[in-house]
Amino acid sequence: MSHHEHDKKIHKCPTEGENYDNPQTVSLAKETTDLIKKEINLSKDAIILDFGAGTGLLGLNFINEVSHVIFEDVSNGMLDYLQYKCDTQGIKNYTIFNGVMEEFKSDKKVDLIMAGMVLHHVEDLKSLFNKFLELLKPKGYLCITDLKKDAPMFNIGGHKHHHVMPHRGFDPEELCKDIKSWGFIKTEIKSVSSIIFKGDNGEKVVSERFMIIAQGP
Protein backbone atom coordinates (compact mmCIF):
# COMPACT_ATOMS: atom_id res chain seq x y z
CA MET A 1 0.00 0.00 0.00
CA SER A 2 1.50 3.33 -1.01
CA HIS A 3 1.88 6.21 1.39
CA HIS A 4 -0.96 7.91 -0.45
CA GLU A 5 -3.46 5.22 0.46
CA HIS A 6 -5.54 5.19 3.62
CA ASP A 7 -4.70 2.30 5.91
CA LYS A 8 -6.25 3.53 9.13
CA LYS A 9 -9.47 2.51 10.81
CA ILE A 10 -11.74 5.38 11.76
CA HIS A 11 -14.16 4.70 14.60
CA LYS A 12 -15.28 8.23 15.40
CA CYS A 13 -17.42 9.98 12.81
CA PRO A 14 -15.43 12.81 11.12
CA THR A 15 -17.58 15.92 10.68
CA GLU A 16 -16.37 17.45 7.38
CA GLY A 17 -17.73 14.68 5.18
CA GLU A 18 -20.84 14.25 7.29
CA ASN A 19 -21.85 17.81 6.43
CA TYR A 20 -21.39 17.02 2.74
CA ASP A 21 -23.72 14.01 2.81
CA ASN A 22 -26.97 15.95 2.85
CA PRO A 23 -30.30 14.81 1.34
CA GLN A 24 -29.62 16.68 -1.93
CA THR A 25 -26.12 15.29 -2.55
CA VAL A 26 -27.30 11.76 -1.67
CA SER A 27 -30.30 12.08 -4.01
CA LEU A 28 -28.28 13.53 -6.93
CA ALA A 29 -25.66 10.78 -6.53
CA LYS A 30 -28.37 8.11 -6.69
CA GLU A 31 -29.87 9.74 -9.80
CA THR A 32 -26.42 9.70 -11.43
CA THR A 33 -25.64 6.09 -10.58
CA ASP A 34 -29.13 4.88 -11.55
CA LEU A 35 -28.63 6.47 -14.98
CA ILE A 36 -25.15 4.92 -15.33
CA LYS A 37 -26.57 1.48 -14.45
CA LYS A 38 -29.29 1.96 -17.09
CA GLU A 39 -26.82 3.01 -19.80
CA ILE A 40 -23.78 0.81 -19.06
CA ASN A 41 -23.81 -2.93 -18.54
CA LEU A 42 -21.20 -3.65 -15.85
CA SER A 43 -20.29 -7.21 -14.92
CA LYS A 44 -19.79 -8.51 -11.37
CA ASP A 45 -16.05 -8.55 -12.15
CA ALA A 46 -15.96 -4.85 -13.03
CA ILE A 47 -13.56 -2.38 -11.41
CA ILE A 48 -14.68 1.24 -10.99
CA LEU A 49 -12.59 4.35 -10.34
CA ASP A 50 -14.47 7.15 -8.57
CA PHE A 51 -12.35 10.24 -9.38
CA GLY A 52 -12.77 13.17 -6.99
CA ALA A 53 -14.84 10.77 -4.92
CA GLY A 54 -15.40 13.01 -1.92
CA THR A 55 -17.30 10.89 0.60
CA GLY A 56 -17.84 8.12 -1.96
CA LEU A 57 -21.51 8.78 -2.72
CA LEU A 58 -21.19 7.58 -6.33
CA GLY A 59 -18.89 4.61 -5.86
CA LEU A 60 -20.69 3.25 -2.80
CA ASN A 61 -23.84 2.87 -4.92
CA PHE A 62 -21.96 0.21 -6.92
CA ILE A 63 -20.09 -1.49 -4.08
CA ASN A 64 -22.33 -4.59 -3.92
CA GLU A 65 -22.56 -4.98 -7.70
CA VAL A 66 -18.91 -4.93 -8.85
CA SER A 67 -15.68 -6.55 -7.70
CA HIS A 68 -13.79 -3.43 -6.60
CA VAL A 69 -14.16 0.35 -6.32
CA ILE A 70 -11.18 2.73 -6.16
CA PHE A 71 -11.94 6.08 -4.51
CA GLU A 72 -9.59 8.97 -5.36
CA ASP A 73 -9.59 12.42 -3.77
CA VAL A 74 -7.24 15.00 -2.26
CA SER A 75 -9.49 15.98 0.67
CA ASN A 76 -8.43 14.31 3.92
CA GLY A 77 -11.70 15.22 5.62
CA MET A 78 -13.88 13.70 2.90
CA LEU A 79 -11.78 10.54 2.69
CA ASP A 80 -11.78 10.14 6.48
CA TYR A 81 -15.57 10.16 6.40
CA LEU A 82 -15.58 7.67 3.50
CA GLN A 83 -13.23 5.43 5.50
CA TYR A 84 -15.58 5.71 8.49
CA LYS A 85 -18.55 4.70 6.32
CA CYS A 86 -16.68 1.68 4.91
CA ASP A 87 -15.48 0.59 8.37
CA THR A 88 -18.90 0.86 10.00
CA GLN A 89 -20.65 -0.91 7.10
CA GLY A 90 -18.07 -3.70 6.88
CA ILE A 91 -17.16 -2.88 3.27
CA LYS A 92 -13.97 -4.61 2.06
CA ASN A 93 -13.82 -4.44 -1.76
CA TYR A 94 -12.39 -0.95 -2.10
CA THR A 95 -9.18 1.09 -2.17
CA ILE A 96 -8.84 4.72 -1.09
CA PHE A 97 -6.19 6.75 -2.89
CA ASN A 98 -5.43 10.08 -1.23
CA GLY A 99 -3.49 12.02 -3.86
CA VAL A 100 -3.57 13.52 -7.33
CA MET A 101 -4.57 11.38 -10.29
CA GLU A 102 -1.20 11.82 -12.05
CA GLU A 103 0.45 9.84 -9.23
CA PHE A 104 -2.09 7.01 -9.23
CA LYS A 105 -0.79 3.67 -10.49
CA SER A 106 -2.71 0.43 -10.87
CA ASP A 107 -1.71 -2.93 -12.30
CA LYS A 108 -5.37 -3.55 -13.16
CA LYS A 109 -7.30 -1.59 -15.77
CA VAL A 110 -10.74 -0.25 -14.89
CA ASP A 111 -14.11 -0.68 -16.64
CA LEU A 112 -15.64 2.64 -15.63
CA ILE A 113 -14.34 5.99 -14.40
CA MET A 114 -16.78 8.40 -12.76
CA ALA A 115 -16.06 12.10 -12.32
CA GLY A 116 -18.94 13.64 -10.40
CA MET A 117 -18.98 17.44 -10.05
CA VAL A 118 -15.19 17.60 -10.05
CA LEU A 119 -13.89 18.55 -13.52
CA HIS A 120 -14.37 22.28 -12.94
CA HIS A 121 -11.62 21.98 -10.30
CA VAL A 122 -9.09 20.51 -12.78
CA GLU A 123 -6.83 22.89 -14.70
CA ASP A 124 -5.18 20.56 -17.23
CA LEU A 125 -8.06 18.49 -18.57
CA LYS A 126 -6.12 17.07 -21.52
CA SER A 127 -3.51 15.46 -19.22
CA LEU A 128 -6.27 14.12 -16.97
CA PHE A 129 -8.11 12.52 -19.89
CA ASN A 130 -4.85 10.97 -21.13
CA LYS A 131 -4.50 9.43 -17.67
CA PHE A 132 -8.09 8.18 -17.83
CA LEU A 133 -7.40 6.46 -21.18
CA GLU A 134 -4.26 4.88 -19.73
CA LEU A 135 -6.32 3.41 -16.86
CA LEU A 136 -9.38 2.27 -18.82
CA LYS A 137 -9.83 -1.17 -20.35
CA PRO A 138 -10.43 -1.20 -24.13
CA LYS A 139 -13.93 0.21 -24.81
CA GLY A 140 -14.14 1.29 -21.16
CA TYR A 141 -16.44 4.10 -20.08
CA LEU A 142 -16.05 7.53 -18.54
CA CYS A 143 -19.05 9.19 -16.94
CA ILE A 144 -18.94 12.90 -16.10
CA THR A 145 -21.46 15.06 -14.31
CA ASP A 146 -20.74 18.75 -13.96
CA LEU A 147 -22.21 22.22 -14.09
CA LYS A 148 -23.19 24.06 -17.25
CA LYS A 149 -21.11 27.09 -18.19
CA ASP A 150 -21.35 30.13 -15.87
CA ALA A 151 -23.69 28.36 -13.47
CA PRO A 152 -24.95 30.81 -10.80
CA MET A 153 -23.38 28.77 -7.99
CA PHE A 154 -19.93 30.03 -9.04
CA ASN A 155 -20.91 33.44 -7.67
CA ILE A 156 -21.71 32.32 -4.13
CA GLY A 157 -19.81 31.63 -0.91
CA GLY A 158 -17.44 28.68 -0.98
CA HIS A 159 -17.12 28.60 -4.75
CA LYS A 160 -15.79 32.16 -4.68
CA HIS A 161 -12.82 31.59 -2.40
CA HIS A 162 -11.72 28.33 -0.78
CA HIS A 163 -12.05 26.19 -3.90
CA VAL A 164 -9.63 25.87 -6.80
CA MET A 165 -11.76 26.85 -9.78
CA PRO A 166 -10.08 26.94 -13.21
CA HIS A 167 -13.42 26.43 -15.06
CA ARG A 168 -16.77 28.10 -14.43
CA GLY A 169 -18.68 25.09 -15.72
CA PHE A 170 -18.77 23.75 -19.28
CA ASP A 171 -20.70 23.83 -22.52
CA PRO A 172 -21.49 20.08 -22.85
CA GLU A 173 -21.27 20.11 -26.68
CA GLU A 174 -17.85 21.80 -26.59
CA LEU A 175 -16.62 19.44 -23.89
CA CYS A 176 -17.71 16.45 -26.01
CA LYS A 177 -15.63 17.79 -28.92
CA ASP A 178 -12.61 18.13 -26.62
CA ILE A 179 -13.12 14.64 -25.17
CA LYS A 180 -13.11 13.15 -28.68
CA SER A 181 -10.02 15.16 -29.63
CA TRP A 182 -8.30 13.67 -26.56
CA GLY A 183 -8.86 10.11 -27.77
CA PHE A 184 -12.32 8.94 -26.72
CA ILE A 185 -14.38 7.49 -29.59
CA LYS A 186 -17.98 8.12 -28.51
CA THR A 187 -19.73 10.72 -26.38
CA GLU A 188 -23.36 11.13 -25.38
CA ILE A 189 -24.98 13.95 -23.39
CA LYS A 190 -27.70 13.11 -20.86
CA SER A 191 -30.03 15.32 -18.84
CA VAL A 192 -29.77 15.29 -15.05
CA SER A 193 -31.36 17.35 -12.29
CA SER A 194 -30.17 20.83 -11.40
CA ILE A 195 -28.42 21.45 -8.09
CA ILE A 196 -29.74 23.98 -5.58
CA PHE A 197 -27.50 26.00 -3.28
CA LYS A 198 -28.27 28.61 -0.69
CA GLY A 199 -26.99 32.00 -1.84
CA ASP A 200 -25.01 34.45 0.28
CA ASN A 201 -28.27 36.14 1.36
CA GLY A 202 -30.18 32.92 1.95
CA GLU A 203 -31.82 32.91 -1.48
CA LYS A 204 -32.22 29.72 -3.56
CA VAL A 205 -29.61 29.45 -6.33
CA VAL A 206 -30.42 26.86 -9.01
CA SER A 207 -27.57 25.67 -11.26
CA GLU A 208 -28.04 23.38 -14.25
CA ARG A 209 -25.96 20.22 -14.60
CA PHE A 210 -25.29 17.74 -17.41
CA MET A 211 -23.97 14.21 -17.80
CA ILE A 212 -21.61 12.96 -20.50
CA ILE A 213 -20.98 9.27 -21.08
CA ALA A 214 -17.82 8.71 -23.13
CA GLN A 215 -16.31 5.48 -24.41
CA GLY A 216 -12.64 4.82 -24.92
CA PRO A 217 -11.10 3.10 -27.96
Question: Which ranges hold each PLM region?
Answer:
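Conserved class I S-adenosyl-L-methionine
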Residues: 1-42, 58, 81, 88, 143-170
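Class I SAM-dependent methyltransferase SAM/SAH-binding core
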Residues: 49-103
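Short alpha-helix
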Residues: 168-183
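Conserved S-adenosyl-L-methionine
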Residues: 184-195
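A short glycine-rich, Lys/Arg-flanked "PGG" loop and its adjoining helix->strand segment in the class I
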Residues: 127-138
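A conserved beta-strand element that flanks and buttresses the S-adenosyl-L-methionine
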Residues: 114
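Core SAM-dependent methyltransferase catalytic element
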Residues: 195-217
